[in-house]
């Protein structure tokens, strides 16, 4: 098959969507398919030329939260260029410029279109309109819902990563058909076996982490909806009982200055370290310096970094959300909490009982096998073939 993946974000940008697209592309290519990524040009000098990545010029978006992204205007003028690819199926991973182009290509070529819902915008109305979110939240949610619905309605199939999102789409009465396919991950870079003890020690030395320190880690976009402040508050309390501890926060985002200010106000910068952006190829090594993974977000559609942490044999201690029921077994490979004081108690408990930490760690890596990128690609391949077959039969009847 010749597959066109339309995405607003791609390498060198780093995000959950980019990770999903990269893994899908590599997985499908391993199955023998020809895969093209159609995406805006991120900048003039920060990407490698790849004939399978079609880059389209766009305008800088003057919003701090969308740094690195580009707005492509009048996308339909690029439809003719896409026709030269002779695509069999279109797979859309965005709701904006490239999504509109993907819909136009599928319609013009009369081929199936698939939409993966990465973000339910009704949980992120502050990105749609801060004014409406503040003064008319119901109107903001209604407007946000239309962003997703234009794709669920017009694509042949919408992929959602979890049953939670599937149920939500049905409950909110979004148009279209839905199927559940968890996004896949290239698990190998996160396995402990991928690194030598010398590599891990070198990173610890670089960060000033002693071997006897207990280390918690978070890898996330630094944004309001991630509730990272709750983790900071809890870790400060935990540190009072176990001062031989460290919390490493990896990631960047619009709320990083706010987070740094909070840490400074708690006089915690000595043991809570925000490292900012880390290259994607190096993230797997950073997981190896930690003992546990923490997260307090309840707005995840699938939680790819959670699976990465589990693949690195890290128990995850996370605020409960039913999206995590798919891969977290409370007390087996992770621990759920709801309130900050519960998180503090859990941290103290596993610090006092290292055998519990060992059991959780042992079970963590095993639980990630269903999320391998090979499984993800095979599931998408099966879906594409089914949609192509149905579409061909429909066209032959006309």
Swiss-Prot record:
Its EC number(s): 2.4.1.337
Alphabetically ordered keywords of this record: Carbohydrate metabolism, Cell membrane, Glycerol metabolism, Glycosyltransferase, Lipid biosynthesis, Lipid metabolism, Magnesium, Membrane, Transferase
First-level EC class: transferase
Main location: membrane
Biological processes, Gene Ontology terms: glycerol metabolic process; membrane lipid biosynthetic process
InterPro entries, alphabetized: Glyco_trans_1, Glyco_trans_4-like_N, Glycosyltransferase_grp1
Origin superkingdom: Bacteria
Record entry for activity regulation: Activated by the negatively charged lipids phosphatidylglycerol (PG), cardiolipin (CL), dodecylphosphate-rac-glycerol (PDG), 1,2-dioleoyl-phosphatidylglycerol (DOPG) and phosphatidylserine (PS).
A single GO molecular function term of this UniProt record: magnesium ion binding
Entries under Pfam families matching the protein: Glyco_transf_4, Glycos_transf_1
UniProt record similarity statement: Belongs to the glycosyltransferase group 1 family. Glycosyltransferase 4 subfamily.
Protein task: Glucosyltransferase involved in the biosynthesis of the non-bilayer-prone membrane lipid alpha-monoglucosyldiacylglycerol. This is a major component for maintaining a certain anionic lipid surface charge density, for balancing the bilayer to non-bilayer phase equilibria and for keeping a constant lipid bilayer spontaneous curvature (curvature packing stress). Catalyzes the transfer of a glucosyl residue from UDP-Glc to diacylglycerol (DAG) acceptor to form the corresponding alpha-glucosyl-DAG (1,2-diacyl-3-O-(alpha-D-glucopyranosyl)-sn-glycerol).
Misc. comment: PG could also protect the enzyme from proteolytic digestion of the proteinase K, possibly by orienting a lysine-rich face toward the membrane.
Protein name as it appears in the record: Alpha-monoglucosyldiacylglycerol synthase
Organism of derivation: Acholeplasma laidlawii
Taxonomic lineage of the native organism: Bacteria, Bacillati, Mycoplasmatota, Mollicutes, Acholeplasmatales
Encoding gene per record: mgs
